């Protein structure tokens, strides 16, 4: 029986604005079949909200934290703070906000 969908909420700290990080995150999330968004925050972080199968969310989190990818992750990630919950709303696709 497949696992229920999960919601990953991740706050990405570092030099992650103005470097293509949200675009890169969107591409990886779509490749993994996730829905949600990546949004710049006023304090310089990027907020990533991704919903879908938990294993896909775990893979995205690994990539956000520095897992090997091609193309390589833009910017510099110092820390990722993540939280898991049940999906709270329905998203169409994955967008940059």
Curated annotation (Swiss-Prot):
The active site is at residues 22, 40. The keyword Hydrolase applies. GO terms for molecular function: acylphosphatase activity. It catalyses: an acyl phosphate + H2O = a carboxylate + phosphate + H(+). Gene3D superfamilies: 3.30.70.100. Its EC number is 3.6.1.7. Residues 7-97 form the Acylphosphatase-like domain. Keywords: Hydrolase. Pfam families: Acylphosphatase (PF00708). PANTHER family: ACYLPHOSPHATASE. Belongs to the acylphosphatase family. This is Acylphosphatase.
């Amino acid at each position: 029986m497949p696992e229920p969908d999960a919601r990953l909420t991740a706050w990405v700290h570092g030099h992650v604005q103005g470097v293509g990080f949200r675009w890169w995150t969107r591409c990886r999330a779509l490749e993994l079949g996730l829905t949600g968004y990546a949004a710049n925050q006023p304090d310089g972080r990027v907020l990533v909200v991704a919903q879908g199968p938990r294993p896909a969310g775990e893979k995205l989190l690994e990539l956000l934290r520095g897992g090997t990818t091609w193309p390589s992750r833009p910017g510099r990630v110092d820390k990722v703070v993540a939280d898991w919950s049940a999906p709270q709303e329905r998203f169409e696709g994955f967008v940059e906000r």
